[in-house]
């Protein structure tokens, strides 16, 4: 008699999950996908990557024993299934919210989360270091890395060292043919052609059944298997990873749960003998038709119910991209480089319209900056579009290859200030501090459409030294009253005749301050140029006011406020300068209102400080 198919209506705890039969697991996969889609209906969440990795995440937790075996996701945002199965399903609706679950793996949240990550390409190095020096030899550490992230320079360095040291670790390559948007690079093209001989898999299966029972016979198994594998490679040829020295298995269908579980069970026994790679193919966005068909990255991270999903809402990024389109029409000598953030930086249309003027170099921030240096030396007018949090990865390249050579490259620094729901790994609050430590840097910040376009023109006209234009991901104000400014200028956002108190600030927070100040006798000065400001004009401002508050949505160290205090002291000015900024670098994640209040940079806290 045929049994009725068991329907799963609740995500089990991890202990019960390990006891489930295959047909139950398949039902659970359907429920997990529904949960992920439900989350994305109500908030901005990482949709496509989590839908694509459902079966792989389930298989890893089913075959291995977390937390004794550690499963670590590169970048970390593909962790929704991992969290739900490891006893956090009841809280999954709170993901990326204040006091809720993190959108990334987070050790402070659960023993099942090995490491906190957020940037791509670092997981192999972390896992190798842990495996080689961890005293508990019984633990397996399984890093999962995408086909885009593995092309990152740091990941390549790790692969080289892992192979050289013969580190016994299993690396899962989750190959979905996508980064956030379409993949680029030669390695992606090579990997798309990888295929493992079926005879190797069949031989391994037979050998394991016969010999993998006792410790002494395991050595015989391994010796025979290696010989057969070498013979197969002699006729078939080695792929890239095998040439480095990895035991390579794949390509398998990572969305086939039964096959993925079976292959992991077999490979699990081989890992102690040396570095091993399992290459799985998955479909990004599987289970949500629009996400499956999305080759642009529109469904990477979004709120499905957002009425602005398909709108042309004007952000700072879209203003910059649209203005550069006009500039390229005027001067075809312009070149734009972006490291893997074409869509989210709003450059997709420009990249299609001017393919010869635009290049996405993949997840390669260091390479992007140094390649820009080469283009500048070739007399191209270069713009680099890059997130603030990723710019910090290229510090040496900025110092050695750009600033030292005084090259006039423009950096459009996106996602500045706080990232809120993404958390600590994505806050753009450190760029001013580290950029100011590099000689010859021009640092600016825009607070509206007019300022951003004006700064792009000034950067385009700049003949020497790197020019940084900071902006947030927020909606870009298109102000009616446009105040012209020249290189190094500061402008009054609000001015009274009798006030002896002023706020100096810059960036998008200027707009919030302006609304709050209108009924108060306080002047508001927009420090468009954070460095290279007109010193005499700034000294005049410092001499005019008794109380000056420097409000910055950046980390306290080496900020504009520090410069102004030094400048006032050097010139023996009597003004009182107070810094209002971010003092805590353990910010976490959450809603804008909650995070601003926690850091005392919400409007109520700022004006309470001024009033006191």
UniProtKB/Swiss-Prot annotation:
| Catalytic activity, as annotated | D-glyceraldehyde 3-phosphate + pyruvate + H(+) = 1-deoxy-D-xylulose 5-phosphate + CO2
Listed A to Z, the keywords are: Isoprene biosynthesis, Magnesium, Metal-binding, Thiamine biosynthesis, Thiamine pyrophosphate, Transferase
Q: Where does thiamine diphosphate bind?
A: 77, 118-120, 148-149, 176, 288, 365
Q: Which GO terms describe its cellular component?
A: cytosol
Q: What's one Pfam family here?
A: DXP_synthase_N
GO MF term list: 1-deoxy-D-xylulose-5-phosphate synthase activity; magnesium ion binding; thiamine pyrophosphate binding
Which SUPFAM superfamilies does the annotation name? Thiamin diphosphate-binding fold (THDP-binding)
Query: One biological process GO term for this chain?
Result: 1-deoxy-D-xylulose 5-phosphate biosynthetic process
Residues bound to Mg(2+): 147, 176
The organism's superkingdom is given as Bacteria
What pathway is this protein said to act in by its record? Metabolic intermediate biosynthesis; 1-deoxy-D-xylulose 5-phosphate biosynthesis; 1-deoxy-D-xylulose 5-phosphate from D-glyceraldehyde 3-phosphate and pyruvate: step 1/1
Binding note for cofactor: Binds 1 Mg(2+) ion per subunit.
- Which coenzymes or cofactors are required? Mg(2+); thiamine diphosphate
This enzyme's EC code(s): 2.2.1.7
Enzyme class of the recorded protein, top EC level: transferase
Q: How does it assemble?
A: Homodimer.
Record's family? Belongs to the transketolase family. DXPS subfamily.
Please name the PANTHER family in this protein's record.
Answer: 1-D-DEOXYXYLULOSE 5-PHOSPHATE SYNTHASE-RELATED, 1-DEOXY-D-XYLULOSE-5-PHOSPHATE SYNTHASE, CHLOROPLASTIC
Its biological function?
Catalyzes the acyloin condensation reaction between C atoms 2 and 3 of pyruvate and glyceraldehyde 3-phosphate to yield 1-deoxy-D-xylulose-5-phosphate (DXP).
Give the protein name, as stated in the record: 1-deoxy-D-xylulose-5-phosphate synthase
**Organism field:** Malacoplasma penetrans (strain HF-2) (Mycoplasma penetrans)
């Amino acid at each position: 008699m045929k049994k009725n198919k068991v329907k799963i209506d609740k995500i089990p705890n991890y202990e019960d999950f390990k006891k489930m039969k295959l047909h139950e697991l398949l039902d659970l996969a359907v429920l997990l996908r529904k949960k992920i889609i439900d989350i994305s209906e109500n908030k901005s969440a990482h949709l496509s990557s989590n839908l694509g990795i459902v079966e792989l995440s389930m298989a890893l937790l089913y075959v291995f024993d977390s937390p004794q075996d550690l499963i670590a996701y590169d970048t970390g945002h593909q962790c929704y299934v991992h969290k739900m199965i490891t006893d956090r399903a009841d809280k999954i609706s709170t993901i990326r919210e204040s006091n809720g679950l993190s959108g990334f793996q987070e050790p402070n949240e659960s023993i099942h989360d090995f490491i906190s990550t957020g940037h791509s390409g670092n997981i192999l190095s972390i896992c190798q270091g842990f495996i080689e020096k961890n005293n508990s030899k019984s633990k397996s550490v399984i890093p999962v890395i995408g086909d885009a992230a593995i092309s990152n320079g740091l990941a390549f360095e790790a692969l080289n060292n892992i192979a050289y040291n013969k580190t016994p670790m299993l690396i899962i390559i989750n190959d979905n043919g996508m980064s956030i948007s379409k993949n680029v690079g030669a390695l992606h093209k090579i990997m798309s052609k990888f295929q493992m001989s079926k005879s190797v898999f069949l031989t391994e299966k037979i050998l394991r059944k016969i010999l993998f029972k006792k410790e002494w016979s395991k050595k015989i198994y391994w010796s025979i298997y290696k010989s057969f594998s070498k013979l197969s490679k002699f006729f078939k040829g080695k792929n890239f990873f095998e040439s480095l020295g990895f035991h390579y298995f794949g390509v398998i269908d990572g969305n086939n749960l039964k096959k993925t579980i079976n292959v992991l069970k077999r490979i699990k026994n081989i890992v102690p003998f040396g570095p091993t790679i399992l290459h799985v193919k998955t479909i990004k966005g599987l289970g949500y038709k629009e996400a499956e068909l999305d080759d642009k990255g529109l469904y990477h991270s979004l709120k499905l119910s957002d009425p602005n999903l398909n709108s042309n809402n004007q952000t700072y990024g879209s203003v910059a991209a649209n203005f550069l389109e006009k500039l390229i029409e005027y001067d075809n000598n312009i070149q734009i480089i972006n490291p893997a953030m074409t869509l989210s930086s709003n450059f997709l249309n420009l990249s299609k319209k001017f393919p010869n003027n635009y290049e996405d170099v993949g997840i390669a921030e260091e390479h992007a900056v140094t390649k820009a240096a080469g283009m500048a030396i070739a007399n191209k007018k270069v713009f680099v579009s890059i997130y603030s949090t990723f710019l910090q990865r290229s510090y040496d390249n900025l110092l050695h290859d750009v600033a030292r050579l005084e090259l006039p490259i423009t950096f459009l620094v996106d996602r500045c200030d706080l990232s809120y729901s993404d958390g600590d790994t994505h806050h753009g609050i450190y760029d001013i501090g580290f950029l100011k430590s590099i000689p010859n840097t021009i640092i600016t910040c825009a607070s509206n459409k007019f300022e951003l376009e004006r700064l792009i023109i000034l950067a385009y006209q700049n003949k020497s030294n790197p020019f940084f234009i900071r902006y947030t991901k927020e909606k870009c104000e298109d102000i009616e009253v446009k105040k012209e400014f020249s290189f190094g200028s500061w402008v009054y956002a609000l001015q009274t005749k009798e006030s002896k108190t002023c706020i100096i600030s810059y960036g998008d927070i200027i707009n919030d301050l302006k609304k709050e100040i209108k009924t108060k006798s306080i002047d508001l000065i927009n420090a468009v140029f954070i460095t290279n400001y007109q010193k005499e004009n700034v000294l005049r401002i410092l001499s005019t006011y008794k109380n000056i508050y420097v409000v910055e949505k950046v980390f306290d160290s080496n900020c504009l406020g520090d410069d102004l205090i030094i400048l006032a002291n050097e010139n023996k000015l009597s003004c009182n300068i107070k810094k209002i900024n971010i003092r805590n670098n353990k910010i976490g994640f959450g809603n804008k209102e909650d995070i601003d209040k926690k850091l005392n940079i919400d409007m109520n806290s700022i004006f309470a400080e001024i009033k006191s």
